[in-house]
Amino acid sequence: MPLRPHIGLGFPAHAYQKRHVEPHDRSTGYQPKVRITDRYRIIGFISSGTYGRVYKAVGRNGKPVGEFAIKKFKPDKEGEQISYTGISQSAIREMSLCSELHHINVIRLCEIVLEDKCIFMVFEYAEHDLLQIIHHHTQQPRHPIPPATIKSIMFQLLNGCQYLHINWVLHRDLKPANIMVTSSGEVKIGDLGLARRFDKPLHSLFSGDKVVVTIWYRAPELILGSYHYTPAIDMWAVGCIFAELLSLRPIFKGEEAKMDSKKTVPFRRNQMQKIIEIMGVPTKDKWPLLSTMPEYNQLNTLANSMASSHHNHHSHHHPHHHHGHYGSRNPPPPGGSNLEKWYYSTINHTSAPGGTPPLASLGSEGYKLLAGLLEYDPSKRLTAAQALQSPFFSTGDRVSANCFEGCKNEYPCRRVSQDDNDIRTSSLPGTKRSGLPDDSLIRPAKRQKE
């Protein structure tokens, strides 16, 4: 039976927002002769990945109105021979889900064009993403993201997650690079290539697409081999993103373990170690189902080796405390956590001696929200709906729908290359462009006037 996009997913009516439908939005049925370049003028090339390439475009003669990001899926390629074997699972999932999802905090799919066996997905354009914004703040002089901006980003991100989860959709790959921000400060969850429905039984993360996703944002239950997905995996990632907005670096920066020849997934020992260094060793008291995890024995081995190396270190050195800005290299005592220490050393950090720490106003409510999102036991971890009710958002400054409101920072625009802006004839991507954040940035002053 041929694969068919999962259209008409029967989402609850309350989940839809009323939205203004432009005349060009109204479906006129399948139009095989509409060419992508008849509808859009390509401004330039943005980036490429395993799926294909992304271009920036505007509507021809101002219709459709606005700027767009066009994602071109490449056909399957065997050697130099292009074989039209169909569409990847990832592309079908992204198309079917995006066609159904309509929310201010989820990137909007405007249309899908099929031309010469290539698929073009046309999305609304976002000038920034969180990776780019975080990177901008790490440039000298290093300066924290303003508290009001962090609050607004977190509220909008949680709002988008709540909408996905109400509609039985797991994103599964939330990370700063996939969280888009428009020039008007609207936060939009993007890249639903790994997203999937969870209202029916699922296979393990690795039994479908063998995709390597960044493991820094991966929930502990997945590292410990859980076969069951819940929206809690997305909430752990949101907690990691919150921590990164505060400290401007990934909180759990582990190393990717290599798959073996049998395509089995090794235990991500190093990633688990990074989590334990800040969160402590998980215990059955706090996480009753812990002992049912497939990698439970591996966890015990890791915890024992960390404890013995910590003991050896202290038997040869005078006891001393690490009050480093980014948490301790030593594991906390059994059942204990360094997260509170990590949080307060981060928000109370100031570059100017005697100055007021810029993030101090986030206070204890920020810690409670972070700790609730980074809860080991997925059944106790905050849901998006619970997190939105956090006093973190109702105390202090009003949360703005524009995360740049009152912001003095001018963020660089997304870099658009003119070298390869022929969307129809461009070669298929041979190599992925460098993933460094500054690869897609240019200073505002150098921005080309359109």
Swiss-Prot record:
Basic residues bias locations = 310-326
PROSITE patterns per UniProt: PROTEIN_KINASE_DOM, PROTEIN_KINASE_ST
CDD domains hit by this protein = STKc_CDK8_like
Reaction(s) catalyzed by this protein? L-seryl-[protein] + ATP = O-phospho-L-seryl-[protein] + ADP + H(+); L-threonyl-[protein] + ATP = O-phospho-L-threonyl-[protein] + ADP + H(+); [DNA-directed RNA polymerase] + ATP = phospho-[DNA-directed RNA polymerase] + ADP + H(+)
Q: Where is this region: Disordered?
A: 307-341, 418-450
Subcellular location, record wording: Nucleus
Q: Where does ATP bind?
A: 46-54, 71
The GO terms describing molecular function are: ATP binding; cyclin-dependent protein serine/threonine kinase activity; metal ion binding; protein serine kinase activity; RNA polymerase II CTD heptapeptide repeat kinase activity
Report the leader peptide range. Answer: none
Q: Which cofactor(s) are needed, names only?
A: Mg(2+)
- EC number(s) given by UniProt: 2.7.11.22, 2.7.11.23
Please state every residue range assigned to the domain named Protein kinase: 40-393
Cross-referenced SMART domains, in alphabetical order? S_TKc
**One GO cellular component, as annotated:** mediator complex
Give the record's keywords alphabetically.
Activator, ATP-binding, Kinase, Magnesium, Metal-binding, Nucleotide-binding, Nucleus, Repressor, Serine/threonine-protein kinase, Transcription, Transcription regulation, Transferase
- Subunit note: Component of the SRB8-11 complex, a regulatory module of the Mediator complex. Interacts with SSN8/FCC1.
Q: Which family does it belong to?
A: Belongs to the protein kinase superfamily. CMGC Ser/Thr protein kinase family. CDC2/CDKX subfamily.
Describe the task this protein carries out.
Component of the SRB8-11 complex. The SRB8-11 complex is a regulatory module of the Mediator complex which is itself involved in regulation of basal and activated RNA polymerase II-dependent transcription. The SRB8-11 complex may be involved in the transcriptional repression of a subset of genes regulated by Mediator. It may inhibit the association of the Mediator complex with RNA polymerase II to form the holoenzyme complex. The SRB8-11 complex phosphorylates the C-terminal domain (CTD) of the largest subunit of RNA polymerase II. Required for normal growth and secondary metabolism.
Q: What is this protein called?
A: Serine/threonine-protein kinase SSN3
- Organism from which the protein derives: Gibberella moniliformis
Lineage of the source organism? Answer: Eukaryota, Fungi, Dikarya, Ascomycota, Pezizomycotina
